[in-house]
Amino acid sequence: MKKTAFNEGWTVRSLTGDSGERQVTLPHDAMISEPRSPESRGEGNIGWYIGGDYEYTKRFTPPAEWEGQNVLLEFEGVYHNAEVWMNGEKLAFRPYGYTNFYVDIREALKFGEENELKVIARNSDQPNSRWYTGTGIYRPVNVWTGGEKYIPVNGVRIDTEDYREGIINVKVRVSEPGEIRVEILDGEETVAVKSHISSKELVNFQIRVPDAKLWDTEHPNLYTARVSFGDDVVEETFGIRTLAWNTTDGLTINGKRVILRGACIHHDNGFLGACAFPEAEERKVRLHKENGYNALRSAHNPCSKAILDACDRLGMLMMDEFADAWTMHKTKYDYVTYLKDWWKQDLKDMVEKDYNHPSVIAYSTGNEVAETARPEGIAFTGRMTRYLHKLDPTRPVSCGINIFFNFLSSIGLGVYSDEKAEKESDAAAKKGGSQKKKPVGSEFYNQLACLMGDKFMKFGATLYPCDLKTRGAYANMDLAGYNYGIWRYKKDMKKYPNRLILGSETFCKDAWLFWDIAKENPPIVGDFVWAGMDYIGETGMGAPEYGDYKMTEDETQMTGGNGRIDITGKRRAEAAYTLVALEQEEGPLIGVQPVDRTDKPGLTGWSLTKAVESWAFNGCEGMKATVEVYSRAPKVELFLGGRSVGRKKTSKTARTLFKVPYEACDLTAVAYDASGNECGRYTLKPAGGETVLRIIPEEETLKAGGLGFIRLRFTDENGVWKPLARDILKVSVAGGELLGLGSANSYVRGNYTTDSTDTYYGEALAIVRAGAGDELKISVTQRSGSEMTELRIPVI
């Protein structure tokens, strides 16, 4: 069937507010522009947004060629409880907000006249999530059309039979028997062709690709399968690669062991909200790749098609996850209400979305589902694993289990339950969402981590009852997902010699320990740090903040604050640390705890440091600075202005601390090997006296209708970043529109859809969409002065 984008010409209006219709282009997130309030029933979990119901409308006259054809609408993601209406007739309801679904509109279409398509997204049923969800049609919409003879949607499946010989299987489903032709293309070149006149509606073509270029994380080679059936032509991109998993070899791609250096990500795209713009999804993948990660976990819901396309192109592995809750509510209105009736359809749709993507290397059925401590939950774990194996026998299945939490849950501490979720929600509603309430579930667990630290959590996971409450579920999956269970690894490898262990959620500070264990032990498949890029919601989880950036009102907290990459896409010093700890960069690298601060931020279990990669603290001369040197070399030495301030044996954690007085001169770290020879050096430079606002686009040119990410940064006259410079910036755009604006501060008054922002450590980010003209102009004014800074970007 032919696919056509159906994203232009929509309007949206609130069903719970008083706003009129607005013209929008999909994808669109209605929540991101809503007001934030202490009255939010979702509270900090969703960034203090209110939530609401919205109606999207598209009026169109169907093309004459659609008449007599099969016509399907595809919604890649609508949050949530989506209703689809055509010309006043309700055609579909889909409760889950993260799965793509299809609606047959053929019989409802009226030809030769205007048709009215309505989609209702209901998100006023708060609370329904533990993180920011967005509202509305936040992923693209497509229309699929096909004649009498056609290849149905998802009718082509491709997998690798033998990577050594380049043999692939192309399974083709057609509407009726007939001739099917398959061409394999490498770029524009046809490298293999096969055709067959079939008497069946499902045909398997086994094809040898000559001199096959394999797909892996370092060489993401892609081919295209062009399948023809009558007048219908379908093209599917794929990679030639096989997966295998066992305790002898670990997880292998094309016969070579791969250790997952992973990061957990939520689905939002920062200032854009939940919108799954292809440019934003690709940027997210690229940023993780640049910072040493080779895998992502789509926490805790199925990811978008756009991010999978980016993973395929860039060589990033993906573990696609199904749901955050199964049978016990974590919030009053979460997906538990519908899961028992929809889980098979949801998993089927997730697999069909993922199957041809070489980047998808595993499925996860859930996250921190305490049901896995009980017999009925263990049984359900097995049912889902077996069902996924039936749908796709080529990939392993996992589930992220919070080991300590399973034990606590089993003795009634912090356990999720329908009754507690109901009680908490009703109490919050009566008191406007601002009451101090007794935490349950993950909120209870997160507060324990903040109060007691990560060691308490990791020690708790080693207790004997934790083993009793997890081993049943682990026996019903291929990869045992350990959330915060790294201190169990060595013991469990001996106790369960046939178990493959995956660190499905881990702390940043344990990167060095994971890597040291995994390198020598194939049963340790990999690690997914919480979290990769920062995200909206789950406020305060890892947000240590100094007083002058911290706001006292709870509702000003916007993000989790625990990303190794901040919400603007800038790497934090923690990401520099993990690059070295995971041996993806030799180092040394340097982080410096802000020199001008005398107060101490409250670090949580998900925080390692507030250090920044800068030595430009103008006005702080003589103040004591804490310098962090990231290196795995035996020894490191720190030089200030060419003078040694000390040589130290490197910490086993790959993070060695020095105390030095701040001076405005070069700060250099030198690493030495076991023989005392220099094996690496790194220098941070001070800043000059002049302060300049620079507009730095990530893209030299923009496509018409495409997105651009533009960093606003205070530097000196030579371009050296000045983290202590601060101002309120007002942004205007000509030849396009401003989609989002903000800084990396976890505390935000208002939202990301205004035209002004405070800077955070001297930086902010603007996200723009180019118009149809030949250039986009961005203008920035500082509150502290009348001077305007401008930049023009060509649009092609």
Region spans (language model):
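Substrate-binding clefts and catalytic carboxylate motifs of secreted carbohydrate-active enzymes
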Residues: T4-N7, T11-L15, V78, Q126, ...
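Active-site-adjacent substrate/metal-binding segments within catalytic domains
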Residues: P35-P62, W66-F75, Y79-M86, A92-P95, ...
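Conserved structural position at the C-terminal beta-strand
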Residues: A121, V227-F229, A671, F714, ...
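Beta-strand-rich binding/interaction modules
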Residues: G166-H196, V203, A625-S644, D666-A671, ...
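Short flexible loop/turn segments that cap and initiate beta-strands
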Residues: E179-R181, E218-L222, K624-T626, R632-P634, ...
